Amino acid sequence: MSETNGPFRIGIGGPVGSGKTALTDRLCKAMRERWNIAAITNDIYTKEDAEFLTRSAALAPERIMGVETGGCPHTAIREDASINLAAVDAMNARFPGLDLVFIESGGDNLAATFSPELADLTIYVIDVSAGDKIPRKGGPGITRSDLLVINKIDLAPLVEASLEVMDRDSRKMRGEKPFLFTNLKTNLGVAEIVAFIERQGGLSGV
């Protein structure tokens, strides 16, 4: 069931290497049997993430589109989202009745956010290997995203990061906004993220 004004658009952001492409891959595979889905990835000078999704068979190749943003990936999702809006329109024309479009940002810093014109729902991915101080550093991705995903929890002992500290700081920085600990390598947390997307997109029980 697509939105009256087009598909429900989920923006997935976060620093380089945090697990954005892995999350996009897992969500596509978990939801593609129930929903009409496309994915758009943003890279600075390549289409590497789109190629990864194609190789992993997250979706059929024609449902995956790579966008080259140039040197400022945050601009393409915030200040001038026209290149991504055009990509969404192209996918919507290619697949009438599209339910969901995942839009993965290029790796950027904690200040990057999606324009509300581009994304109906935002998921921000950080990872434990960057240290347990990341949630308390704040930034729009940490504090304003609809869902914060704290990935790679299996690495916590190796980098001496405290999940308890990250839990406490995430609650403090986000207030009532939800967050989840995940290990995308093993699909831990994926079902909860799927349920969140379906609930927020009015897709549950359809």
UniProtKB/Swiss-Prot annotation:
Answer yes or no on keyword Nucleus. Answer: no
Residues recorded as binding GTP, renumbered to this chain, are 14-21
Q: Which GO terms describe its biological process?
A: urea catabolic process
GO CC, one annotated term: cytoplasm
The record's subcellular locations are:
Cytoplasm
What keywords does the record list, in alphabetical order? Chaperone, Cytoplasm, GTP-binding, Nickel insertion, Nucleotide-binding
Which molecular function terms from Gene Ontology are attached?
Answer: GTP binding; GTPase activity; nickel cation binding
The UniProt entry, under InterPro entries, shows: CobW/HypB/UreG_nucleotide-bd, P-loop_NTPase, UreG
Alphabetized NCBIfam families for the sequence: ureG
Xref: PANTHER family: UREASE ACCESSORY PROTEIN G
Q: What function does the entry list? A: Facilitates the functional incorporation of the urease nickel metallocenter. This process requires GTP hydrolysis, probably effectuated by UreG.
Q: Which family does it belong to?
A: Belongs to the SIMIBI class G3E GTPase family. UreG subfamily.
Q: What is this protein called?
A: Urease accessory protein UreG
Q: Which organism is it from?
A: Methylocella silvestris (strain DSM 15510 / CIP 108128 / LMG 27833 / NCIMB 13906 / BL2)
